[in-house]
Amino acid sequence: MPENLEIRPSSFENFIGQKKLVETLQILISSSQKRKQSLDHILFYGPPGTGKTTLANIVANVLEAKIKYVQGPLLEKKSDVLAVLANISPDTIIFIDEIHGINKNIEELLYSAMEEFVIDLQIGVDGERKIMRMKLPQFTLIGASTKLAQISTPLQNRFGYVAKIVDYTLEDMIQIIRNSSAVLKLKMNTEIIKYIASFSNNTPRIANNLLKRIRDFALVLNAKRIDKDIVNKTFDSIGIYNQGLSQINIEYLNLLVKIFKGKSVALDVIANVLKEHRQTIINIIEPPLIEKELIEKTSRGRRITKKGRDYLLELKTN
């Protein structure tokens, strides 16, 4: 089994965090089984790496259902949607990742498919067009998105359960790291687990990726147990800083201080200097900086906070 799948929980019992969401899913699944009907359509939304795909896989495991994986941005034409829906067996789960990326011009094809399990197709040339109705077996569509606002209201309304992935706690992250380190056969004490968790941005995918890199260094350095020295060597090498910030986060903070002297700066100006797309800045670079109150948004743009200045000062002294 590939390592990523081995680390990934395969049951609700092994899934850490999202307690209310998991309880709701278990009730929905149990109800659908008792009614002998397909599970209602589900939409998960939240930041990258927080378990949306894992939850979809667990739902499929519990239902003992086939799961078909699709990337939303690849659904560009009607034929793409038809290819996904063609030849599915009853109770199949169709998982569309980044569902907000579907071409909006073909979204309507999904409406009748989700509501009535049919697709109406126009056939023939102008003047002789006919509507052919194609029946589909009952299925469950599970969507995942990092950008809920980009999903149209009509499509959102077709989902019976829209679930937000809430923030993971430090305790959640400690348990996730403990479980994953056991799978990777890494020996470490609770202090080291907490230390690694502090670099994870409370994101399971980041925590697991850090563990795999620590494993690589420990293996090459013949370390029997994981200590702080091994962890720090790993993080220094891959450019992970205190509180889990990356090199690009540090460049962003330094830019606000060194180039713009702590003044507010427009997003487009920052994007131009960093040579990064504005959406990359908004969705990837800024969230941890805003969450940790290292920068703030003002009417004039972005500005570093006192916390942000103190953070950079601490980096210099370490």
Curated annotation (Swiss-Prot):
GO cellular component, one term: cytoplasm
Primary localization class, coarse: cytoplasm
GO MF term (any one): four-way junction DNA binding
Alphabetic keyword roster: ATP-binding, Cytoplasm, DNA damage, DNA recombination, DNA repair, DNA-binding, Hydrolase, Nucleotide-binding
UniProt-recorded name of the protein: Holliday junction branch migration complex subunit RuvB
EC annotation from Swiss-Prot or TrEMBL: 3.6.4.-
PANTHER family documented for this protein: HOLLIDAY JUNCTION BRANCH MIGRATION COMPLEX SUBUNIT RUVB (PTHR42848:SF1), PTHR42848
Region (Small ATPAse domain (RuvB-S)): 169-239
UniProt comment concerning the protein's domains: Has 3 domains, the large (RuvB-L) and small ATPase (RuvB-S) domains and the C-terminal head (RuvB-H) domain. The head domain binds DNA, while the ATPase domains jointly bind ATP, ADP or are empty depending on the state of the subunit in the translocation cycle. During a single DNA translocation step the structure of each domain remains the same, but their relative positions change.
Assembly and oligomerization: Homohexamer. Forms an RuvA(8)-RuvB(12)-Holliday junction (HJ) complex. HJ DNA is sandwiched between 2 RuvA tetramers; dsDNA enters through RuvA and exits via RuvB. An RuvB hexamer assembles on each DNA strand where it exits the tetramer. Each RuvB hexamer is contacted by two RuvA subunits (via domain III) on 2 adjacent RuvB subunits; this complex drives branch migration. In the full resolvosome a probable DNA-RuvA(4)-RuvB(12)-RuvC(2) complex forms which resolves the HJ.
Residues given in the record as Mg(2+) binding sites: 53
Binding site for ATP: 7-8, 49, 52-54, 158, 168, 205
Source organism per UniProt: Mesomycoplasma hyopneumoniae (strain 7448) (Mycoplasma hyopneumoniae)
Reactions accelerated catalytically: ATP + H2O = ADP + phosphate + H(+)
Ranges for region Large ATPase domain (RuvB-L): 1-168
GO process terms (BP): DNA recombination; DNA repair
The protein's role, per its UniProt record: The RuvA-RuvB-RuvC complex processes Holliday junction (HJ) DNA during genetic recombination and DNA repair, while the RuvA-RuvB complex plays an important role in the rescue of blocked DNA replication forks via replication fork reversal (RFR). RuvA specifically binds to HJ cruciform DNA, conferring on it an open structure. The RuvB hexamer acts as an ATP-dependent pump, pulling dsDNA into and through the RuvAB complex. RuvB forms 2 homohexamers on either side of HJ DNA bound by 1 or 2 RuvA tetramers; 4 subunits per hexamer contact DNA at a time.
NCBIfam families assigned: PRK00080.1, ruvB
